[in-house]
């Protein structure tokens, strides 16, 4: 059976991921007029720029949807976001600033929950607004087929008939007006924005050019921290984790993770925390650029990793970072529920996150400028008395350290012999100023 349909399947049910924007509105109306039976599905992901979710299904019905459903995905989205924090599932960083994979997390939830709802309604053809150059077309493809093995894909934006008739936003707006809907195009921004409760992505248009900076972006989850006219007073915040799970902010315990994430967003957003500018590799290996917001994720991540470094040993922390980066890449590629990802998630949550209990107090200032003021945990292996420089009882003596250093002679001797062996083969050069062979200076080599 053909998985991807290039032309409209007339007379058949088609589920469309309906945002209520111009593109999906025009596509839904066009499909109905051409003889398909569209069903509209809207994911409530807690988008910070969406004012009225209940109005979206009503609009879909007006445009010709056979049925329209609003699917509340917020609880699952936050659960996956917390899992990503527990696992450090983030692989894109620049200068120490992290992209928290908020769009990939949203796609994992949307792609599974909407297709599951479609399956309940007997809808086995799915359409969405992703383009053929982006990551989402592959993410939705994978998650959709994982959820429904009988699923077929129809995307109006890959249908030449649709493109010929409604190839641009102006044509779509004119089409809606001609059909009796007073649909005005929204004011065009200098970039495109996609968001959910975990974060916002700003990309494309002017942001494709690297001489356009974060300063052209109007944050939707935070403030313009780079604008000196914006007053941002310093603020102390305390985050508490229990067995890897964030449970309290500033002493207030949350039984609802959605409410906890909303409050974390409010706190971090007041400072512009978690905003970053990233050049990344898309799934197809072409580079793209995005400016991201994730105030709540950033706040929780900082506190989590502070506890992590005080609780776990060096080798465990090294594995956390290595496996987290690997898992982050799988998440980015739309493989969050693949077996290799589940294996990594299980080990990181079981053996790392389960021990993360305690409180971290921070002072937030402007943007990503903050200080850690205090760290408290019953699980800390950080024991200042072990290494104190003050006189007193010690867990080991000077003689113990002499013995430990003497044992190092074994590998130091081996290393010295290897260095001189490399020099004999020409890999290293002898140095008049050093007692050991050195890597040859390339400038001298060319003279």
UniProtKB/Swiss-Prot annotation:
Major subcellular site: cytoplasm
Q: Which PROSITE patterns match?
A: ARGININOSUCCIN_SYN_1, ARGININOSUCCIN_SYN_2
The compartments listed are: Cytoplasm
GO MF annotation, one? argininosuccinate synthase activity
GO CC terms, sorted: cytoplasm
The top EC class, named as a word, is ligase
Residues bound to L-citrulline = 99, 135, 139, 192, 201, 203, 280
EC assignment: the record states 6.3.4.5
Ligase as UniProt keyword: yes
| SUPFAM superfamilies recorded | Adenine nucleotide alpha hydrolases-like, Argininosuccinate synthetase, C-terminal domain
Q: Does the keyword Ligase apply?
A: yes
What CDD domains is this protein classified in?
ASS
**One Pfam family in the UniProt entry:** Arginosuc_synth
Which reaction(s) does its UniProt entry say it catalyses? L-citrulline + L-aspartate + ATP = 2-(N(omega)-L-arginino)succinate + AMP + diphosphate + H(+)
**What keywords appear on the UniProt entry?**
Amino-acid biosynthesis, Arginine biosynthesis, ATP-binding, Cytoplasm, Ligase, Nucleotide-binding
GO biological process terms, alphabetically, are: argininosuccinate metabolic process; L-arginine biosynthetic process; urea cycle
Q: Where does ATP bind?
A: 17-25, 43, 129, 131, 136, 194
Identify the metabolic or biological route this protein is part of: Amino-acid biosynthesis; L-arginine biosynthesis; L-arginine from L-ornithine and carbamoyl phosphate: step 2/3
Specify which residues bind L-aspartate according to the UniProt entry for this protein.
131, 135-136
Family membership noted in the UniProt record? Belongs to the argininosuccinate synthase family. Type 2 subfamily.
Question: NCBIfam families from the xrefs?
Answer: argG (TIGR00032), PRK05370.1 (NF003779)
- Subunit-level organization: Homotetramer.
* Protein name per UniProt: Argininosuccinate synthase
Protein source organism: Escherichia coli O139:H28 (strain E24377A / ETEC)
**What gene is it encoded by?**
argG
């Amino acid at each position: 059976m053909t998985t991807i349909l290039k032309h409209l399947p007339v007379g058949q049910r088609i589920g469309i991921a309906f945002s209520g924007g111009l593109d999906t509105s025009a596509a839904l109306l066009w499909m109905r007029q051409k003889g398909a039976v569209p069903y509209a599905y809207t994911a409530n992901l807690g988008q910070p720029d969406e004012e009225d979710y209940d109005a979206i299904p009503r609009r879909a019905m007006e445009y010709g949807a056979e049925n329209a459903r609003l699917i509340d995905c917020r609880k699952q989205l936050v659960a996956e976001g917390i899992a990503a924090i527990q696992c450090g599932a983030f692989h894109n960083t620049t200068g120490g600033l992290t992209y928290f994979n908020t769009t990939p997390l949203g796609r994992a939830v949307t792609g599974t929950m909407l297709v599951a709802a479609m399956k309940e309604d007997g809808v086995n053809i799915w359409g969405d607004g992703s383009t053929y150059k982006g990551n989402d077309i592959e993410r939705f493809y994978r998650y959709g087929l994982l959820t429904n093995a009988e699923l077929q894909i129809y995307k109006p934006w890959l249908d030449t008939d649709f493109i010929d008739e409604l190839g641009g936003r102006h044509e779509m707006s004119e089409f809606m007006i001609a059909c009796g809907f007073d649909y005005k195009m929204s004011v065009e921004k200098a970039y495109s924005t996609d968001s959910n409760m975990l974060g916002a992505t700003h990309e494309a248009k002017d942001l494709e050019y690297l001489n356009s900076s974060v300063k052209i972006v109007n944050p939707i989850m935070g403030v313009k921290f780079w604008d000196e006219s914006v007053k941002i007073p310093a603020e102390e915040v305390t985050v508490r984790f229990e067995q890897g799970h964030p449970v309290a902010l500033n002493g207030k315990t949350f039984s609802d993770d959605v409410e906890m994430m909303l409050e974390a967003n409010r706190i971090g957003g007041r400072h512009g925390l978690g905003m970053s500018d990233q050049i990344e590799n898309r799934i197809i290996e072409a580079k793209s650029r995005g400016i991201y917001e994730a105030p709540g994720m950033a706040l929780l991540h900082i506190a989590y990793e502070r506890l992590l470094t005080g609780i776990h040993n060096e080798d465990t922390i090294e594995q956390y970072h290595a496996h987290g980066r690997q898992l982050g890449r799988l998440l980015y590629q739309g493989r969050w529920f693949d077996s290799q990802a589940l294996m990594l998630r299980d080990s990181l949550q079981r053996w790392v996150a389960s021990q993360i209990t305690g409180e971290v107090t921070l002072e937030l200032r402007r943007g990503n400028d903050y200080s850690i003021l205090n760290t408290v945990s019953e699980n800390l292996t950080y024991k200042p008395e072990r290494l104190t420089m003050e006189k007193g009882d010690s867990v080991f003596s000077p003689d113990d350290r002499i013995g430990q250093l003497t044992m190092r002679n074994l590998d130091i001797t081996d290393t010295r012999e290897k260095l001189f062996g490399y020099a004999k083969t020409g890999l290293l050069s002898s140095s008049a100023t050093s007692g050991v062979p050195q890597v040859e200076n390339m400038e001298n080599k060319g003279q």
